[in-house]
Amino acid sequence: MHEYSVVSSLIALCEEHAKKNQAHKIERVVVGIGERSAMDKSLFVSAFETFREESLVCKDAILDIVDEKVELECKDCSHVFKPNALDYGVCEKCHSKNVIITQGNEMRLLSLEMLAE
């Protein structure tokens, strides 16, 4: 249930951005959640609804989640691609097994809609 600690940090980050931008209210929070992030979206939403109640700035914020697909990069030929299956072990161009995940294994804050004072 690491979703609760992640959302707690997300709310704190939102409050920081609001303060920095002299906003008194955040209306919308848009996050990208990678398909390999090990994040349970229903728990994430539940945690957000719980934690936003404790924040004056985020109390009425709407949460939008963007699903982010995995993106891979081959370290041998530099080819960047999105795999068609869950087989992340082979480059589709040169067939090397030297590939890394470059996107889709994290949760990112993509944007905030705020009301300035």
Swiss-Prot record:
Ni(2+) binds at residues 2-3, 40. InterPro entries: Hydgase_Ni_incorp_HypA/HybF_CS, HypA/HybF. Keywords: Metal-binding, Nickel, Zinc. Zn(2+) binds at residues 74, 77, 91, 94. GO terms for biological process: protein maturation; protein modification process. GO terms for molecular function: nickel cation binding; zinc ion binding. Disruption phenotype: Mutant has negligible hydrogenase activity and is severely impaired in urease activity. Monomer and homodimer. Forms a complex with HypB. Involved in the maturation of [NiFe] hydrogenases. Required for nickel insertion into the metal center of the hydrogenase. Is also required for urease maturation. PANTHER family: HYDROGENASE MATURATION FACTOR HYPA (PTHR34535:SF3). Belongs to the HypA/HybF family. This is Hydrogenase/urease maturation factor HypA. The gene is hypA.
